[in-house]
Amino acid sequence: MTTTSEISLQEEYVTDAVDHRGLAARRSNTGRWRAALFIIGVEVAERFAYYGIGSNLISYLTGPLGESTAVAAANVNAWSGIATLLPVLGAFVADAFLGRYRTIIISSLIYVLGLAFLTLSAFLIPNTTEVTSSTSSFLNVLFFFSLYLVAIGQSGHKPCVQAFGADQFDEKDSQEKSDRSSFFNWWYLSLSAGICFAILVVVYIQEEFSWAFGFGIPCVFMVISLVLFVSGRRIYRYSKRRHEEEINPFTRIGRVFFVALKNQRLSSSDLCKVELEANTSPEKQSFFNKALLVPNDSSQGENASKSSDVEDATALIRLIPVWFTTLAYAIPYAQYMTFFTKQGVTMDRTILPGVKIPPASLQVFIGISIVLFVPIYDRVFVPIARLITKEPCGITTLKRIGTGIVLSTITMVIAALVEFKRLETAKEHGLIDQPEATLPMSIWWLIPQYLLLGLADVYTLVGMQEFFYSQVPTELRSIGLALYLSALGVGSLLSSLLISLIDLATGGDAGNSWFNSNLNRAHLDYFYWLLAIVSAVGFFTFLFISKSYIYRRVDRV
C-alpha cells in the first residue's frame, strides 16, 4: 500500500529522470515548458541554418560552382536524401552509447564546423572566370566535404533535440502528458517559422549580396543555438536509465529476437516457463513469447528474456506496418520543392507593378499555413475534440496521421485540377510550343495546394513525430523520431524512382513524357492524379492497419 509520504515524493520528483547532477529531478525546478522553450529555440536556429543552405542550394551549384542543371539536381537530391536518412544512425549512437544530451553537443560542433567550412569555400571562390582546374577541384572537394559534414551534424542533432525536448514532460503525469502533446504542436510551429525566415531572408542575401555572407549567417545562428542549449543544462531532465543501466537497449532487444528464434526450433515438451507474468499483455506475439522460455536441460534463466524486453521488441515490430503506410504521405510530400515550383515558373508571377515573386518563395505559404493553424488546432480543435472523444489529446495520434493523409490526397487532386487549367490556358493562347513564354494565369492559383499541404503537415508530420516518439521503448526515443524522418527520406527516393520509370515509359523528351522539359507539353496533371490514387490506396491500407494497432502501455515506460 502506497503511503502518504511516498505519494508526496512521487508528486515532488519525476520517477524516470534525473537533474544535471544525477539526482532525482524535482518537478518544480526542472523540465516542462521552462526547459522545453530553450530546446525549441535551439531547433529554430538549426532549421534556419539547414534551410538557409538547402533551400537555394541548386542556385549555388548552377551559379558559382558552374554545374549543369541535371548534375546540380542530382547532387541536391543525393545530399537531401542522405541528410534525411542519416538521423537513423545518429539516433542509434545516441540511444545505444552517448545519450541524447552528449550527442546533441557533439553533433552541434560538427554542424558548426561544416557550416564554417562551407562559408570558407564560398569566400574562396574568385570573382573572375579565370579559375584553374586545380583550384576548381579543390573548391569542389571543400564544398562537398563541408556539405556532407553538415549532413552528419544534422544526423545527430535532428532526432535527439526533439526527443530531448519531449523528455522534459513526464508522461506518467496527466497534465504533463497533455503538455507534451502540445509541445509537438508548438515545436512544429516554431521550426516552420524558422524555415520561413530562412527562405525569405537568407535566400535574398545569397542572391543579392554574397554567398559567403549567406552561408555565414546560418553558421552564426548554429553557434548561438549551441550556447543557448548549454546554458539551459541546469533545468533539463535527463534520462534516468542512461545514468543507471549499463545494458545497451539494442543488446537487450536483440537478445529477445535471438532467443525467440532459437527456441522456435524446439518443441513445447523441451521448454519450461521461466518468467511469464500473470498480467502479461495479450497483444504479445507468440513468436516473442518463446523468448520467455528456456530449454529444460538448461540452467535456470540461462536463455530467458525479461517480460519487459519482450514487450519492447513487440512494440518495435508493430511499428513497421504503420511506417510503411506513412509512405503514402511521404511520396506526395516530396513534390512541393520540385514540380510545384516548375509550374510557377511558367505562370504570371507579378504581385505588384514591376515586382515578381520567385517561384520557390511560394514554399513560404506552407510555413504560413502551419503557423496559422497550429494554434487553432492546439487551442480550439483539441479542447472541443477532447469533450467528444474523452482523449487527453483530442484524437489519437493514428487518427491525426490518417487525417493528414486524406488532406494530402485532396492536395494532389487540387494540384491536378490547377495543372489542367494551366495546360488549357497554354492551348487557348497558342503557347504550347513556347515554353519560355509567361502564361496569362496568375501564380496565385498555386496557393491553395501549398496552404493545404501545410495543413496536412500539421496533422500527419506532427502526428508521426508524437506517435513514433511515444510508441518506442523509452531508451530508443531518438530512434523513434528518426523513423519519422526516414519515412520522408524513403518517400523522396521512391518519388524519384517513380518519376524516372514514368519518364522512361512515356518516351522522355523525345516522346510524350509526363515530365517533358517543355512543361506545356507535359502531363503533370496525370502524375498528380496518380499520386492522389497512391495516397488514397495508402490511406485505406493505413486505416486497416491502424484499426488493429494496440498502443504501447505507458505505466511501465
From Swiss-Prot:
One of its GO terms (molecular function) is dipeptide transmembrane transporter activity. It is a multi-pass membrane protein. Expressed in roots. Coiled coil: none annotated. The chain crosses the membrane at residues 35-55, 78-98, 104-124, 133-153, 183-203, 209-229, 320-340, 357-377, 401-421, 443-463, 479-499, 526-546. One of its GO terms (cellular component) is membrane. The keyword Repeat does not apply. It is found in: Membrane. CDD domains: MFS_NPF5. Pfam families: PTR2. Keywords: Membrane, Phosphoprotein, Transmembrane, Transmembrane helix, Transport. Its main location: membrane. The modification Phosphothreonine is found at T103. Belongs to the major facilitator superfamily. Proton-dependent oligopeptide transporter (POT/PTR) (TC 2.A.17) family. This is Protein NRT1/ PTR FAMILY 5.14. It comes from Arabidopsis thaliana (Mouse-ear cress).
